């Protein structure tokens, strides 16, 4: 994945580097860093492949243009024995931030989820994803969605005016490393 992404970046004039190291299970791993508007970002197409908990048609952006703080020494460990890659500390091109899917507090996160469920139901999109600023907020919104059943309220409200009626049949999927929550909707 990482070599292919590097090739695609090269073909399109996007400055990039292949980063090697290990993952959180000490297995060899490679990912890219790419330069967007003068800033470097981590990009891991391997870990954004929808394998496992997600349907094959789902496009994740968990590891798309993320900072070192989000992944280094958590899930990605750089082998910097021979070189030190540029720091990746910018956030402005991050997918969720760039598309208004980022929240810095619980109320904003819940409001985003509610509006994204409505948008998804109108367009028959089966997926909602947002990013939050802390693990506490991630846990708080998950509790609100599941324990307090807010997710069902949001779906019911969306279905009142949506072009397509949706339902939720699985619990939201959390990625505590990059602070994202994913909701799958069925039609």
Task: Map each language-model feature to its residues.
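N-terminal accessory/pre-domain segments preceding catalytic cores
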Residues: 66-187
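Hydrophobic/aromatic-rich core segments of domains that either
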Residues: 1-66
